[in-house]
Each structure stands twice: as C-alpha cells, then as structure tokens.
UniProtKB/Swiss-Prot annotation:
The keyword GTP-binding does not apply. Keywords: Cell cycle, Cell division, Cytoplasm, Cytoskeleton, Mitosis, Phosphoprotein. Multiply phosphorylated in a cell-cycle-dependent manner with the major phosphorylation occurring in mitosis. Part of a checkpoint which monitors spindle integrity and prevents premature exit from mitosis. This cell-cycle arrest depends upon inhibition of the G-protein TEM1 by the BFA1/BUB2 complex. GO terms for biological process: cell division; mitotic spindle orientation checkpoint signaling; negative regulation of exit from mitosis. Interacts with BUB2. PANTHER family: MITOTIC CHECK POINT PROTEIN BFA1. This is Mitotic check point protein BFA1. The gene is BFA1. To S.pombe byr4.
Amino acid sequence: MSIRPLTLNGLDEPETSFEELNTTLPRFQSHETLTLEENVPPLSTSTYIPPPSSVGTSDTGTVFSNSTSAFWSNKQADDDQDMEVDQDDEFLNDFQEFQNKKDDFDDAIKTNFHLRNGCRTGPFKNDIFAEEFDRKLSLEDKPRLKQPRSMMELKPKRKLSNSVTSRNLRSGNSVRFKKSMPNLALVNPAIREEEEDEEREREDQREFNYKIDNDTQDTILAKFSSDDEGDFLTGFEELEGEAIDETISSNDKESADHPRFLKKSSSSLPLKISPAQYDIVKHDELLTPGLHRRQRDWNTQQELDSFKEKRSVRHCSNQNVQLNGPAKIKTIKQQIDHNTPMKKGSMIYNPKTMKWEGNENVLSKFSDVDTANRKALLIKNKLQRDADSKKQKYSDLQHARATSRNQKVIGNMILDEQNLRWVSVSEEEADPFAGIPEINLPPVGKSMKKRSSSPFLRSKSQVNTPFVSNDNDGVYQSTAAQARLRKYHSMRTLNGTTETPEISSTFHLSSRALEKFYHEENRWCKKLASWFIPRDETIISVDEETIMDESTVNSKRKSYMYEIRNMVINSTKD
C-alpha cells in the first residue's frame, strides 16, 4: 500500500458517521505528507485557527488529517511492512489503552501513529507532536471561554463615592459581631470577688514598692511579688549613672506594667448585670435611690420628700398675673340624674316621688291582682264582668276623645289611636258573647254535705288504709289524707241506690279515668303517710257539719307542702 499527498481543495469529503466508519485497512509501504500552511490566509487582525484532527474513510482509502498536514492511505498490500507492524503490535499491547480492542480499529490507529513517527519530510516533526502532548498534559491555568458570572462577581471592587449602602458605611478594618451573638467577654455570669481582692492587694503592693528618691533622682527600686507571675522578677538592682526621665507619667508606668498590645482581661471589663443579682447593702451616701430597696418607713411624706431634687421655685404674686386675652365661657350642660324632671310621650317623671306618672288608668287593672282575700279559681259573673268592661272601655274612649287634640273624624266614625281602629260615635260596640247562656254555680259548701263514693269497688287493702287515727274513745276516724273532697260527682251513693244529683255535672268522666285518679291519689297518700301526725291542726274531717270556706281549706291543706320540700332539700344536701 502506498500513500500519496492529498489535495484538500478538490476533495469532496463524504458525510459519514462513526457507525459507518470502515476500519478494515490494508497495510501500506510508504507515506507522504501534504503541507497545509500554504492555504493559510495572510495575517490580519484575527488569528488563524487550524482545523481539528479527523479521520475519513472511503472505498478507495483512508484519510488522516491534523492541524498541519493530511495523509491518504491506499489499499495495496505490502509484505515488507508486515514485520514492522507486528513489532508495533507487540509494543502497543504493553499499554492498557490498546488492549481488548477490535483488530481493524487498532490497525487504523497504529497506522496513524506509524505515519506520524515515520514522517521526516515537511514541516511536521515529532517535536511538534511532543510539545502538543506535553501542553495537553500540563496542569497550568488555561484561557477559558467566558462564562456567565453571578451578581456577586459583577459588583464593583471599589466603593462608590456617592453610595450610602450599609456595606459602605461600615469600616473595613473593624470586626463585626452578629447582634444575636453577644460578646461573651462583656458578660461574666460568675462574680469572682476573691480574685478582685487579690488583684487590689497586688496593685497596693506595687505602689508601695515604687519608691522614688527626690534628692538623688538616680535610682529606682522596684520589687514585684506575685504568685501568678512567678519568681523570675524578684527585683531590680540600683541603676547608677543613668538619668531618670522626668516626663514619665503614671499612665506610662501603668502601660509599662500592662502593654497596650495585650488584651484586657474579662475582670477589667465592665459587667452588665442587673442590680437584682446583688445583695445591695443600704448605704445612703453611696447608693442611688434607684438601687435602694423599698422600706416600710418610706410611706411618710417626709421620707418621700428626701428623694426630690432641690430646685429654686419662683413664686409669682397674684397681683402681677394678667390674662393675655378674654377667657372663653364654656357652655354649661345640665347632667341628667334622678333629680331631673323628664317627659317621654304621655309619661312624666316626678323627681320628688322618683316615679313616672301618667298611666294611672292602665295600672288600675292590676290593682286587685295581689289581694289576699281573692279566690284563686273563682269565676265571676259574666254579665257583671261584661258590664264592668264596657264601662271601662267607654270611659277610656271618652277620656281619649277629651285628651286627644288631633283626632281623625270621618263622618260618624272616629279613629281610636290606642287600639288602632275606627269606632262609631253614636252606636255602641256589639257584644261578641251575646246569645251564650250563663251557668250559675251554687255555693260549694252546701253541695259537699253529702258524701259520694266512687262507682267502682274497693279492695280489702284499700279499705284498710294506714291513714287512720285512734281517738280517745277507741273509734277509728278518717284523716285528711284519706277523706279528700271529691272534685267529681257520681251516680251511686253509699247505700247503692241511684238518686238524681242536686247539681248536674259539668264534665262527664269515664269510669276508667276516675279509677286512674283514685289509684294515683292512694299512691300519693302512701308516700306522705309518715310525714304527718294524726289529729293535726291541718286535718279537716268530712263528717263536720260546717265546712269552712274553700280558700281557707285549700290554704291549710297546702301549708305543709313547703315544709316537706324544705326537709327533702336539706336531706339531699347532707
């Protein structure tokens, strides 16, 4: 196989991919190079960038090219070259990079290396390849392409003259601490009083050991005795022939003992601790009033005046006081209280009696509500009640007509503003209960003289009830709990004969309802059997000829109920 130089101007390189690469290359004998520097354009403002190295294959041969030259290999076999290639195979197999590869692809790479090493004609030399290889392996900084920088990198390196940001206002040399992190050197939680006393003793000892002779002014005697500093400074000998600098002050002496470059100890720094952590001793000359604890004897005015600041007060005489202008008279507003008479509609408040007046007609309806002699369930005569109501309505209407000024009158009708309706002036109102017959009930005392029995038979247990009392004569008499007045009337008497009752019954009750009422009454009597004493004052016998008034009987019969209620409530509390 022979290699000849390839002209790049007339070469049409086919577009191939890595999969289409033909690696079955025959051996070749000789090789030639083609210089690419002839096609380099003349130097201008822009530099020339050589093309990268590439490998192209076709049916006729393979083309190898780099930045300086191009090579073309033919498919003609040569037996003389096989021995050299075998030697190269043995040499390349020693490297790990060229192992476990395909034979055809390895041959192409070997051929490329062989052409580079064997080429001696032309500008391409082995030294150029070695320099490029060394340059790629070097770890020095290389010029890179410009990458997009962040906003922090784009900030100016120097401070702007007119900038008022917080970063420019801070000094660059000072050390900044976060506000959330306090300076631990300023806060010492443990108060080391013993070390402070020792330090005071050391200072007193140093001042005592400094003795300056005013007559000679040529010697300084100093002696340091400290447990912490050791015994390496036991003292100084007399210094003869050396003049003393009189300009040395006490501050310079202190700076000599404590150089400026040394950091101050935490004990010398001020402690920021509240006075509540100390046990403050009462001392009027040293302590401020803010540090004093409150004493009980400070409640007097004299003790409190001791804390006032003494200032010169100028007293102005009343004669020299003059008003700059006329004073404004404020409006006097009356405050509403219980002594202020008021009016609201037709009602007038009387401050003397502290009551509202003007509704006496309305209050008259409630005058007989709380009377003591009023019967609770007494039904009045309907005719009398209707007559009273008509008179009251007529009087109210006449009063309303007399008092009202702006009355609306249309024809024979007048407006009733209280009930919001039209009323005839001449005619009276129609009675809505006209035509209903009245029921006149006889007195209760006369109707209950005869005792009535229930329409059903009683059992033996019910007959022998425990609610009996033994009289002195040995005759059993019924108690008030057993002999209740019946609220109903039956058709059967004690002898079993049917008689027409004197009073017609108002309500018709069935025998089942009457039996239910009877059993409930007996059950109630059993529960209250042990709560009463026989022959009590509240006991009312049915056999008595004279029966008291119904209101008096009911009041006596119900008087014990509140006593029972109070006893039950008190028993549950215990």
